[in-house]
Amino acid sequence: TAARRRLRSACLRFLTALATSHPAAQDKLQPTLHSFFVDEKGEATATAQLAADEAAHLALEVLRGNRGVCRRVVEETVRAIASSLHRERPSALRLRVLQELCCPQGRPIAANQLHVVRALTERHVALVLFEDGRAERARLRAAAAAGDAAAASRLDYHQELLRTFLCCACGRCAEAEVVLRGVLPID
């Protein structure tokens, strides 16, 4: 309950600090990434969001600049991260985790690109960008410019979603590009 949530939060922060710039720690933590994104039943809204954001910070530090670790991430982990994108509110931070997974050190990993594209597009888990079309995007931009935090958060999410798709399209993963051509008006 409350004590358990505080303990989990402290553990996630400790592991994040441990993984920062330590390849050996990143290597040891990589197999456990999936467990940090599994939804805990019965968590309060704000608490679940905080835990998911702390897990995303940990994942970023585990993956950051470590191609070997990124190559070993399995599709199940990618799907867990993708399914956590909309817990309570859209999360641009968790999209950054997927970007790092696709292109660590700016060099794409084709298998990860395909896993990410599939996870984001198969059930339209992340495609809020296309819900209401152009009018919705214009409304979000205007609301964000006026200081509406919720609109700014959704707009940030949309921008990160496009960056994530860009990370998935760069490189030599033709299958990911084909899927993206079906989702985005590229031509």
Regions found by a protein language model. Give the residues of each.
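Elongated alpha-helical scaffolds that mediate protein-protein interactions in large eukaryotic proteins
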Residues: 1-187
